[in-house]
Design a protein with these regions (language model features):
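Domain-level signature for soluble enzymes in the chorismate/prephenate branch of the shikimate pathway
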Residues: 1-280
Length: 280
């Protein structure tokens, strides 16, 4: 059976690189063939899975410079049938693509907001006067370059090769260790792996309510590798709390913790148990 993989397109995005890496891993380890299916937005990629049109989605969840990709967290929170199955981490490379002969000619730079943010210091240092225009992906802005010799795009060196656009500067990311976590999401129940992500809301904004919830894990010495909050989108000051922890939902300690947590939270959602793929 052929597996369909949704991701943020078009061709040349970092999400496509992650989808290809995952597809290659499936072929090498499970003899599973995959079809890559680009979508114009992360939301539409996840929606295609939730509606049963596509088998799985490969979506970015966190960048080492810019932090969480909040659209993914928000969709997982409000969509009941999506589950995280695997995680992979890839290094991210950003270059400046342009037909301009020099930096001095550039007046406009296109890229996805994450791409612009991950190169913010470089752009402020070398192109402080340019107009930054956000696009849906790091490759969408490339289509404007041939018609405008004063325009540039922040995208990957791989995209420069695919679209045959000159790479004016090969490496402009702010930090050399820039990398992004990607989640593999499907509608199948996920309870395998040694990592677990969940989210919860509290019944009321009372003193100590969050501490009480976190103490459930502390008492059992369960390691929380990440804690963050997102607006509930209901009213100002209401939040959803998101946690990554190490362990499996079937472990006795974690099972007890989740049972107790469900008793002191308004809504508790398990995004999934998953393993981290050894993809370099």
């Amino acid at each position: 059976m052929n597996l369909s993989l949704a991701y943020l397109g078009p061709t040349g995005t970092n999400s496509e690189t992650a989808a290809i890496a995952y597809a290659d891993w499936l072929t090498a380890h499970h003899q599973q063939q995959s079809t890559l299916c680009p979508y114009p937005s992360i939301a539409l990629a996840l929606q295609s899975v939730a509606q049963g049109q596509i088998s799985q989605a490969v979506v970015p969840i966190e960048n080492s410079i810019e932090g969480s990709v909040t659209v993914v967290l928000d969709i997982l929170w409000r969509t009941d049938n999506l589950q995280v199955h695997q995680e992979l981490t890839l290094p991210i490379f950003h270059g400046l693509l342009s037909y301009a002969a020099s930096l001095e000619q550039i007046k406009t730079v296109y890229s996805h907001p994450q791409g612009l943010a991950q190169c913010q210091q470089w752009l402020e240092s070398f192109l402080p006067q340019v107009q930054l225009i956000p696009t849906k992906s790091t490759t969408e802005g490339i289509k404007f370059l041939k018609e405008d010799l004063t325009a540039a795009a922040v995208s990957s060196p791989r995209a420069a090769q695919l679209y045959q656009v000159p790479l004016l500067k090969a490496d402009i990311k702010d930090r050399p260790d820039n990398c992004t976590r990607f989640w593999i999401v499907s509608c199948e129940k996920s309870d395998r792996g040694n990592y677990l992500s969940l989210a919860f809301s509290l019944p009321k904004n009372a003193p100590g309510a969050l501490v009480k919830a976190l103490e459930i894990f502390a008492r059992r010495e369960i390691n929380l590798s990440k804690i963050e909050s997102r607006p509930s989108k209901r009213s100002l000051g209401e939040y959803v709390f998101l946690i990554d922890l190490e362990g499996n939902s079937q472990d006795i300690q974690i099972k007890e913790a989740l049972t107790e947590l469900s008793q002191c939270t308004e809504v508790l959602k398990i995004f999934g148990n998953y393993s981290k793929l050894p993809i370099p």
